[in-house]
Regions:
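Walker A/P-loop
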Residues: 11-25, 59-97, 112-115, 143-144, ...
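Pre-Walker A (pre-P-loop) alpha-helix and adjacent loop at the N terminus of AAA/AAA+ ATPase modules
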Residues: 26-69
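Short glycine-rich substrate-engagement loop in P-loop NTPases that contacts/grips substrate
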Residues: 52-54, 93-125
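Conserved catalytic/switch belt of AAA+ P-loop NTPases
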Residues: 62, 132-171
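A short helix-turn-beta junction within AAA+ P-loop NTPase domains corresponding to the substrate/partner-engaging
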Residues: 92, 166-180
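Conserved AAA+ ATPase "SRH/arginine-finger" region at the nucleotide-binding site
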Residues: 98, 174-187
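C-terminal helical "lid" of AAA+/P-loop NTPase domains
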Residues: 209-214, 220-234
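Conserved C-terminal helix/linker of AAA+ ATPases
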Residues: 230-254
């Protein structure tokens, strides 16, 4: 069975900060995002150009052979989710770290453990969130372990890799752009939320569209807002004005490092 490890545990598009559980293991009282966590790559919305049969990730899965990649995209587009499900799809051990919270000691431990698993024929997918936060020397530290196959690296970044990552690291990894989720993809997330809750959101059709528009392509934000709406009882569905009054207005520009 595939082994999963987090050093430390990290958030993703559909989950909080705990290691991923299978849908059957998620409690009915868990946050909405956890209960909507995809179980397969095919369930990830909005990135079909990458995960579909003709996409780079889809082709890797079909071939059963995964190369190191850098996932570049805005927040809330499913970078961590995609990496975790990619490991599942090709049968790799999944380890996730964050460049914000991890240092040299953490990396040494990850690589040492990956070598031990490699000796028994178990390969490791190492997911590095916010990989651009590692300095140049730390980025260089990945090279020998990527080159000898100790780990297959999947890095995630919201920043342009050409400016933030070493040329040597980029030459050993394929950069894949993940798109901001469009209206149909976000609407599909709300459909799933309504299905799992067993009731529609307390919104008029126009307010539902306004909620989708307010997410600005961020699926994580949308699900959090939906959960907020489900936590309150309303006498009647909210119209756009009522929705705007209820929810805090979304900040137009996020901290680029969130």
């Amino acid at each position: 069975m595939r082994d999963a490890a987090y050093l430390p545990c990290m958030a993703d598009l559909f989950g909080g900060t705990e290691p991923a559980a299978s849908p059957s293991e998620v409690s009915a009282s868990a946050p909405l995002a956890d209960r909507l966590r995809p179980a397969r790559l095919e369930e990830v919305v909005g990135q079909e150009h990458r995960t579909g049969p003709e996409g780079a990730i889809g082709r890797m899965v079909a071939a059963g052979k995964l190369s190191s990649i850098i996932l570049w995209g805005p927040p809330g587009t499913g970078k961590t989710t995609t990496a975790r499900l990619l490991a599942d799809a090709v049968g790799l051990r999944f380890v996730a770290i964050s460049a914000v919270f991890s240092g040299v000691a953490d990396l040494k431990k990850v690589f040492a453990e990956a070598k031990e698993h490699a000796r028994i024929g178990q390969r490791t997918l190492l997911f590095v969130d916010e990989i651009h936060r590692f300095n140049r020397a730390q980025q260089d530290g990945f090279l020998p372990f990527v080159e000898d196959g100790t780990v297959t690296l999947v890095g995630a970044t919201t920043e342009n890799p050409s400016f933030e990552l070493n040329a040597a690291l980029l030459s050993r990894a394929q950069v894949l752009i993940l798109r901001r989720l469009d209206h149909p993809a976000l609407s599909q997330l709300l459909d799933r939320a309504e299905a799992i809750e067993g009731r529609p959101l307390p919104l008029t059709p126009d307010a539902r569209d306004a909620l989708v528009a307010s997410a600005d392509g961020d699926g994580r934000f949308l699900l959090n807002q939906a959960e907020t709406l489900y936590s309150v009882s309303f006498d009647a569905p909210l119209d756009p004005a009522g929705l705007s009054a209820f929810l805090q207005r979304r900040v137009a520009v996020y901290d680029k490092d969130r």
